[in-house]
Amino acid sequence: MNGYWKPALVVLGLVSLSYAFTTIETEIFQLQNEISTKYGPDMNFYKFLKLPKLQNSSTKEITKNLRKLSKKYHPDKNPKYRKLYERLNLATQILSNSSNRKIYDYYLQNGFPNYDFHKGGFYFSRMKPKTWFLLAFIWIVVNIGQYIISIIQYRSQRSRIENFISQCKQQDDTNGLGVKQLTFKQHEKDEGKSLVVRFSDVYVVEPDGSETLISPDTLDKPSVKNCLFWRIPASVWNMTFGKSVGSAGKEEIITDSKKYDGNQTKKGNKVKKGSAKKGQKKMELPNGKVIYSRK
């Protein structure tokens, strides 16, 4: 076991080193943390040095700018600016070095790490995904899992039915040219079910005497419509908007049918209002209907 642990420890050590900050990075982070805490989160080295061209300043301009600031903030002239001058000098040294300046510009663009003494210094905080993103991710994973499970179940059931049909055909001594009666029992105490092999097709005999074909094609194929991804929105639609749309359609049909019946009734009344033939007597019933007697 010791032989297996050594490579793992080496890899772990390399990974730890890859995530450790260099000395210059630590200096940059520390100075950036100090000036952003004192002057605001938008403060950076270029603004701190009061460079006219900011990030477009050349190395020569950055060095020359420090000489200009030294006339006012050098501690020999004013001791109270000692800490400020140290920061100005360090920022100038970092930006006047091309490789160090690239490092600073990278973190300035992509973000600086946070600082916490209890966590061992500087660290990058992990981005916390939003609630809707987590819910959407879980929703997608659940539906994909449900669809995969339905495919596995479908294939398993289809394979089981195909094997059962194959076993029944092996008992058919007519070679698919006649009819063979079989009895299927799951265990000895089972009453069993009657089966019929008719021209290579297997049927189960129902209690009422009808026959049902046993075929893997009768299984419902996996579909997205059977997943929650489709069923829940469809159910919500049917209970809300779909219900109102359906009832509106029914009302329209009923209204049209009433109009149609009314027209037919009027036409019928016109026919009934015809005069009686010769030899017929007109009689009015209590319900208002008018009839005519035969000749």
Swiss-Prot record:
<comment type="similarity">
    <text>Belongs to the DnaJ family.</text>
</comment>
<feature type="topological domain" description="Lumenal">
    <location>
        <begin position="21"/>
        <end position="130"/>
    </location>
</feature>
<feature type="domain" description="J">
    <location>
        <begin position="42"/>
        <end position="110"/>
    </location>
</feature>
<keyword id="KW-0256">Endoplasmic reticulum</keyword>
<keyword id="KW-1133">Transmembrane helix</keyword>
<dbReference type="GO" id="GO:0005783">
    <property type="term" value="C:endoplasmic reticulum"/>
</dbReference>
<dbReference type="InterPro" id="IPR052606">
    <property type="entry name" value="DnaJ_domain_protein"/>
</dbReference>
<keyword id="KW-0812">Transmembrane</keyword>
<keyword id="KW-0143">Chaperone</keyword>
<feature type="compositionally biased region" description="Basic residues">
    <location>
        <begin position="267"/>
        <end position="280"/>
    </location>
</feature>
<protein>
    <recommendedName>
        <fullName>ER-localized J domain-containing protein 5</fullName>
    </recommendedName>
</protein>
<dbReference type="InterPro" id="IPR018253">
    <property type="entry name" value="DnaJ_domain_CS"/>
</dbReference>
<dbReference type="GO" id="GO:0006457">
    <property type="term" value="P:protein folding"/>
</dbReference>
<dbReference type="Pfam" id="PF00226">
    <property type="entry name" value="DnaJ"/>
</dbReference>
<dbReference type="GO" id="GO:0005789">
    <property type="term" value="C:endoplasmic reticulum membrane"/>
</dbReference>
<feature type="topological domain" description="Cytoplasmic">
    <location>
        <begin position="152"/>
        <end position="295"/>
    </location>
</feature>
<dbReference type="InterPro" id="IPR036869">
    <property type="entry name" value="J_dom_sf"/>
</dbReference>
<keyword id="KW-0472">Membrane</keyword>
<feature type="transmembrane region" description="Helical">
    <location>
        <begin position="131"/>
        <end position="151"/>
    </location>
</feature>
<feature type="signal peptide">
    <location>
        <begin position="1"/>
        <end position="20"/>
    </location>
</feature>
<dbReference type="InterPro" id="IPR001623">
    <property type="entry name" value="DnaJ_domain"/>
</dbReference>
<feature type="region of interest" description="Disordered">
    <location>
        <begin position="259"/>
        <end position="287"/>
    </location>
</feature>
<comment type="function">
    <text>DnaJ-like chaperone required for the folding capacity of the endoplasmic reticulum.</text>
</comment>
<keyword id="KW-0732">Signal</keyword>
